[in-house]
Amino acid sequence: MTTDTLPVLAILGGTGDLGTGLARRWAQAGYRVIIGSRTADKAEAAVADLREVMAERGVAAVAVEAMENQAAAEAADIITLTVPFSHQASTLEQLKPALQGKILIDVTVPLVPPRVARVQLPEQGSAGQIAQEILGEEVAVVSAFQNVAAHHLQEGAGLDCDVLVCGNKKEARAEVIKLVEAAGMRGFHAGMINNAAAAEALTSVLITINKQYSCHAGIRITGLDHAE
């Protein structure tokens, strides 16, 4: 499968650790990836860094480019939002027209500093539900990747980590699971967007575990032997 037959991916807020980690993995898997940022300079710097990392890994060419968030959202088929919770709603309100008819992967975790190790879900239930309410039913919001350490994503090694994928449209969840697998992990249909609350809450639990045991913990789904 070539970049001509794969969906075009955009990562909004793609200059942070999580965004660059996903960009590296998807670009290496052969996807055309657009790194979006509020400023073109930051996006271009992230692209330059990604190309340098790919060269170090022996990957000769990758289809990656830099754009401001608006242009990135317009150009892509599937958009991933990796901005902090404090910027989620305003970013989605601004980009709502450009996202209509597309899949939005919402990676947002409603962390409230300084107590990020404490579960503090919003009144709406979850960040995923907030995204769906803002964008409307013409946008397939899919919640995923909340429980993956950015540190692991940026490395080139395999990932012993699973991803819970929540969204109201099964077909959209299936598309996101393909991207999870392209990034080197297992993805699981985890139900409607309301269930995103579970994955989002788990992040604070994992932060607590990471601090306690000096690790980068993830989650693993067990008991699947009978299905293989």
Regions found by a protein language model. Give the residues of each.
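NAD(P)+-binding Rossmann beta1-loop-alpha1 motif at the extreme N-terminus of oxidoreductases
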Residues: 2-52
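Phosphate-coordination loops involved in phosphoryl transfer and adenosine-cofactor binding
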Residues: 5-8, 101, 160
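Hydrophobic Val/Ile/Leu positions in short beta-strands of Rossmann-like dinucleotide-binding domains
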Residues: 11-12, 81, 165
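Rossmann-like NAD(P)-binding element
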Residues: 57-103, 110-115
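General beta-strand structural signal in soluble alpha/beta enzymes
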Residues: 66, 140-144, 188-190
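Rossmann-fold NAD(P)-binding glycine/threonine-rich loop
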Residues: 108-155
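Active-site-lining helix/loop region of Rossmann-like oxidoreductase modules
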Residues: 162-228
